[in-house]
């Protein structure tokens, strides 16, 4: 029943009341993604919760097809084929296959860092490109970070964890010796959501002080946890930028923790 519901517009919405818009604690909350994808592609969802086999549902969200039994290991597979096959005007705006795959790969790597408890496998042209098993220990989390960011980062990073005034910052902070000429080793997550925010970036760099050359970029994989009511995740259409209710408090906290 839930699989059929997942394809319906707003069927997977996490919102029960309008007031929850001020306390968004999930990556998606409107329930629009799957039906939107299904309307412009051939979408198949297969899922199983145990060893008794699974269920699958395929086709556009409006055709009323019920889930059918299928063989599937525990977990969920969402397969999308022939994107924009029914909207050729949109299809011509797609970049090359290589470029589009890079976008997918980048998104998967960010997601893999924010969801250590979930395993991810990415296949391309019939070949497994990324395979991240669930990371349920600190050692396995470090191993995943090494796979995603690079072993050079993990070997030169310091584990941090600080909690005060309703804010918690934890993760891996690269030492100044591995600072980069560009910000390609910067991964920041707020309540599990990957972001790029000027307040956060400035605070972290300020925390390094004089030990980091102004032209160099710090390397980090950091997680900020806070009350969802204290951050607006709808500040930007792409959801990459956020707006903090108390920017000064967040900035000061981040800068202080990094400086320690």
Predicted stretch roles:
Residues 1-260:
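N-terminal phosphate-binding caps/lids of nucleotide- and nucleic-acid-binding domains
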């Amino acid at each position: 029943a839930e699989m059929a519901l997942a394809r319906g517009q707003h069927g997977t919405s996490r919102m029960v009341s309008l007031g929850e818009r001020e306390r968004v604690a999930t990556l998606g909350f409107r329930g629009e993604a799957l039906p939107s994808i299904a309307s412009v592609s051939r979408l198949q969802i297969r899922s199983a919760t145990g060893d008794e086999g699974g269920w699958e549902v395929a086709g556009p969200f409006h055709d009323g097809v019920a889930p059918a039994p299928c063989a599937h290991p525990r977990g969920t597979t969402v397969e999308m084929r022939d994107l924009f096959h029914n909207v050729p005007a949109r299809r011509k705006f797609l970049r090359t296959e290589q470029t589009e795959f890079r976008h997918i790969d980048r998104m998967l790597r960010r997601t893999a860092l924010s969801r250590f408890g979930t395993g991810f496998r990415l296949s391309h042209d019939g070949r497994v490109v990324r395979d991240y098993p669930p990371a349920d220990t600190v050692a396995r989390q470090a191993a995943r970070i090494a796979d995603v960011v690079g072993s050079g980062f993990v070997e030169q990073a310091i584990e941090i964890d600080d909690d005060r005034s309703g804010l918690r910052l934890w993760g891996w902070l690269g030492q100044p010796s591995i600072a980069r000429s560009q910000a390609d080793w910067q991964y920041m997550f707020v309540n599990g959501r990957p972001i790029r925010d000027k307040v956060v970036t400035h605070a972290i760099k300020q925390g390094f002080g004089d030990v980091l050359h102004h032209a160099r970029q710090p390397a980090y994989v950091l997680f900020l946890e806070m009350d969802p009511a204290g951050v607006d995740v709808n500040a930007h259409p792409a959801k990459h930028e956020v707006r903090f209710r108390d920017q000064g408090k967040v900035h000061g906290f981040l800068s202080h923790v990094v400086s320690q």
